[in-house]
């Protein structure tokens, strides 16, 4: 895991704003009594992940199927889920997401881990 990814995850743990180079973490508290805070992760100003107060992680490559995007998303997945059964990988130029040991093709859009 890269240093910037460790710092990104620490910001999520601390529930604090973080910005370094091309990576940013923000805290969003929606209005409403039952609303839960979210930690949002951005890469080059693209919203690539949301981590909720109840431990849910949603990921999105935003059309940027790059090594850096995959690395940021995998570090988040490893933070919240078993890395031996969950993650993102590329095969024959296509992205796949593994959830609980099952592989799925990963089209653009949001995916819950």
Regions found by a protein language model. Name each.
Residues 1-113:
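Terminal leader/tail segments of proteins
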């Amino acid at each position: 895991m890269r240093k910037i990814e460790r710092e990104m995850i620490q910001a999520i743990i601390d529930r604090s704003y973080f910005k370094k180079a091309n990576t940013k973490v923000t805290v969003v508290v929606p209005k409403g009594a039952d609303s839960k805070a979210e930690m949002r992760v951005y890469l080059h100003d693209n919203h690539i992940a949301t981590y909720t107060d109840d431990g849910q992680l949603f990921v999105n490559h935003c059309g940027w199927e790059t090594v850096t995007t995959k690395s940021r998303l995998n570090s988040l997945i490893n933070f919240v889920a078993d890395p031996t059964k969950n993650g993102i990988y590329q095969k024959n130029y296509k992205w796949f997401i593994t959830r609980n040991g099952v592989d799925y093709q990963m089209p653009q859009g949001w995916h819950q881990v």
